A protein has these predicted regions:
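Beta-strand/loop nucleic-acid-binding surfaces
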Residues: 471-486
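Conserved phosphate-handling catalytic cores of large alpha/beta enzymes
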Residues: 109, 118, 123-133, 137-204, ...
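Non-transmembrane, aqueous-exposed alpha-helical and coiled segments at domain scale
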Residues: 406-412
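A short acidic, amphipathic alpha-helical/loop segment
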Residues: 127-132, 327-330, 431
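Short, acidic/hydrophobic/Gly-rich beta-strand patch recurrent on exposed beta strands
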Residues: 315, 466-472, 511-514
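Hydrophobic helix-and-loop "lid/oligomerization" segment in the mid-to-C-terminal part
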Residues: 2-115, 135-136, 153, 184-398, ...
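Accessory interdomain/linker segments of ATP-dependent helicases and helicase-like nucleic-acid enzymes
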Residues: 417-470, 476
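OB-fold single-stranded nucleic acid-binding module
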Residues: 392-396, 488-522
Length: 522
C-alpha cells in the first residue's frame, strides 16, 4: 500500500483514521430508521392509510427532472407493493412548467381526487394547495426545496430540514424513500436504488445520510437484478460516475425534449414489470437521449464563434429551453468565461435563458445587479436562469458584458495532491477509490504532476490531444491540449484525476488531465 498517498488523502479530506473508518465502515439497512426520525411522518402515513381505507383516489404529482421522476416512481411502486392503484402526473416543462399549478389543482378536484401527494415540489405551491384545501382535498407535501418563512397550508409536510431529520439537504426522491420506509415498515432495495440515483442527479452533498445511502446501494448492487437500471447503465459498473454520466442524462433528456404527457412513460418504465413493454420504453429513452445529444451539439456548434477578446458569451438560439443549460455548460467548459444562452418563448415576446459561469464569477449576483432588465431570475453562484422582454436583449447583453469586464474572474485555488509518474498505477487508484463515492461536498481528489518534460509527451494523430502511454496499462490522457500550445513550454505542471478506462476489453489506469500550466523557470 502507498502509505504516503494514503496520508495525503487523509489530509486532503481533513480527516484522521477515525474519520476514515467512519466513511468506509459498512453500511446496512439498520443505518436507516423506519421513518420516525422525520417529524409527523407517522401521522402522514396514517392520513394516507385513512384515505386508502375507503378507497379514496390518490394523485401523486411529481416533477420533470430525474429527482422528480425517481421520487414519483418510489411512491407509485410503494403503492403497487400494497396493491393500491394511484394516479400520477409528471408535468411537462413547456406546457405545465414546474410544480403543482392552479389548473392541475382544479383538475384534481374535478376528478374527485381525495389526496394529493406532491413529490420534489409543493413547498412553494401556495395558491394551488389553498384551492385544494378549500374543496376538502387533503394534501401531503414531500419536498426538499428551500422553504419560505410561511409554509403552504398542507395537511403534512415531509422535508429533510423542516421535519428535523437532519441538517444536510437531500433530494426529493430520498425524502420519498424515507416515507416509504415508514409506510411499508421495511427497507426496499429497489426503492433505495432509485433514491440513490437522485442524490447524484440532483447534486446533493455526498455526506452524512446521503453518503450512507449511496455507498450502501453501490456496494450491494448486482447486475441483472433490476432490469431498468441495467438497461440505462448498459455495460458500465454501477457507481456515482455511471449515474452522473449515463443514467441521469437519459432520464433528464425526456423532460428536456418531450412535449405533452409522454414524460409519464418514465414512471411506467420504473414501476412496471412487463419485459416487452420495458424494452419498448428503453428504446424510446435511448432514442430521445440521442436526439438530446445531437440537438445540444448542433446548437453549441452554431454558437461557437467566440473571440478570445470577448469577456462573455451571450447568444439567442432556437434550441429548446430544456437544452439551454447544457449548451451554456459546454461553452463555459470550452472557453472558461460566463455564458448566457437564451431562446424565445411561444409568443416570441419573451426570452428565457440559462447562465453558467466558471468559478470566481457569481451568476445570481450578476442577475441582481441587472435585475431592472429582467422579468424573473434565480439560481446560485455558478448557474442560474432568467426571463426578459425580447426588446431588452441588446441592452441586457451589453450591460452583462460590461459587468463581466468590470468583474475580473478570481481564480479559485484548489487543494491538490502532488504525485509522481510512478504513482499512476492500479494500487493508487484502489487507495483513492476507498474514499469514494465522490461528488458534491466530497470531490474526487485533484492530483498534480510537477515539471513534466513536454518532449516526453505523445499526441493523437491530429495533434490535438495528449495520449502518452507510460507503462503497460497506465497512461496520460488530455483532451483539447494541442501539441502546438503544450510544446511552447519545456516543462509543465499537470492537474487531473486518476480514472480507470476500459476499451475493447483492455483496462488502463489514466491520469486524465484537466489543466496544464507552465513550470519553466524564468
Amino acid at each position: 500500500m502507498n502509505d504516503k498517498l494514503f496520508e495525503k488523502l487523509l489530509n486532503y479530506y481533513h480527516i484522521d483514521m477515525e474519520g476514515y473508518k467512519s466513511i468506509t465502515s459498512p453500511v446496512d439497512e439498520s443505518n436507516f430508521a423506519l421513518g420516525h426520525s422525520f417529524d409527523h411522518i407517522e401521522e402522514a402515513v396514517a392520513l394516507v392509510k385513512e384515505v386508502m381505507s375507503h378507497n379514496g383516489k390518490i394523485l401523486i404529482y411529481g416533477d420533470y427532472d430525474a429527482d422528480g421522476v425517481m421520487g414519483t416512481s418510489v411512491l407509485v411502486k410503494m403503492f403497487k407493493y400494497v396493491s393500491y392503484p394511484v394516479e400520477y402526473y409528471l408535468p411537462n416543462r413547456y406546457e405545465d412548467g414546474y410544480g403543482l399549478t392552479i389548473k392541475k389543482a382544479q383538475e384534481a378536484i374535478e376528478n374527485d381526487i381525495e389526496l394529493v401527494i406532491t413529490v420534489d415540489n409543493g413547498i412553494s405551491a401556495f395558491e394551488p394547495i389553498e384551492i385544494l384545501k378549500s374543496k376538502g382535498v387533503k394534501v401531503l407535501i414531500i419536498d426538499h426545496h428551500q422553504a419560505q418563512e410561511i409554509l403552504p397550508l398542507a395537511d403534512f409536510i415531509i422535508h429533510p430540514i423542516l421535519s428535523h431529520f437532519g441538517e444536510v439537504p437531500s433530494s426529493g426522491a430520498f425524502t420519498a424513500f424515507m416515507f416509504s420506509l415508514a409506510f411499508l415498515k421495511r427497507f426496499d432495495k429497489y426503492l433505495s436504488t432509485l433514491a440513490a440515483i437522485s442524490l447524484v442527479s440532483d447534486i446533493m452533498p455526498l455526506v452524512s445520510y446521503n453518503r450512507n445511502l449511496l455507498r450502501m446501494v453501490i456496494a450491494n448492487y448486482h447486475d441483472r437484478e433490476f432490469f431498468q437500471i441495467d438497461a440505462l447503465k448498459e455495460d458500465e459498473p454501477f457507481n456515482e460516475t455511471t449515474i452522473g454520466l449515463k443514467i441521469a442524462p437519459k432520464i433528464n433528456a425526456i423532460g428536456r425534449l418531450i412535449d405533452g404527457d409522454d414524460i409519464n412513460r418514465l414512471v411506467a418504465f420504473f414501476t412496471e414489470g412487463d419485459k416487452s413493454q420495458l424494452l419498448s420504453y428503453i428504446s424510446w429513452i435511448n432514442e430521445v437521449n440521442e436526439s438530446r445529444k445531437t440537438a445540444s451539439k448542433s446548437a453549441s456548434d452554431s454558437l461557437d464563434h467566440y473571440s478570445p477578446d470577448e469577456p462573455a458569451i451571450v447568444h439567442v438560439t432556437d434550441a429548446k429551453e430544456g437544452l439551454l443549460g447544457l449548451i451554456a455548460n459546454q461553452l463555459v467548459n470550452k472557453y472558461q468565461v460566463p455564458c448566457i444562452v437564451l431562446t424565445k418563448d411561444k409568443s416570441g415576446d419573451l426570452l428565457k435563458g440559462s447562465c453558467r459561469a466558471p468559478e470566481g464569477f457569481n451568476v445570481v449576483e450578476a442577475f441582481q445587479t441587472l435585475s431592472k432588465y429582467l422579468l424573473a431570475y434565480g439560481g446560485h453562484a455558478s448557474a442560474g436562469g432568467c426571463t426578459l422582454d425580447s426588446k431588452n436583449f441588446e441592452i441586457f447583453k451589453a450591460e452583462f458584458i460590461k459587468l463581466v469586464k468590470a468583474t475580473p474572474l478570481q481564480k479559485v485555488k484548489k487543494d491538490q495532491i502532488s504525485i509522481g509518474i510512478t504513482d499512476i498505477n492500479e494500487d493508487s487508484y484502489r487507495i483513492i477509490q476507498a474514499f469514494s463515492p465522490f461528488g458534491e461536498s466530497w470531490p474526487a481528489p485533484l492530483l498534480s504532476l510537477k515539471r513534466v518534460d513536454t518532449s516526453s509527451l505523445f499526441f493523437s494523430r491530429d495533434e490535438k490531444h495528449i495520449l502518452t502511454q507510460i507503462g503497460h496499462s497506465t497512461r496520460l490522457t488530455g483532451f483539447n491540449f494541442p501539441r502546438s500550445e503544450v510544446q511552447q513550454h519545456r516543462f509543465i505542471d499537470l492537474t487531473g484525476h486518476l480514472r480507470i478506462n476500459t476499451y475493447r476489453g483492455f483496462k488502463n489506469i489514466e491520469f486524465l488531465i484537466s489543466e496544464i500550466s507552465s513550470s519553466d523557470k524564468s
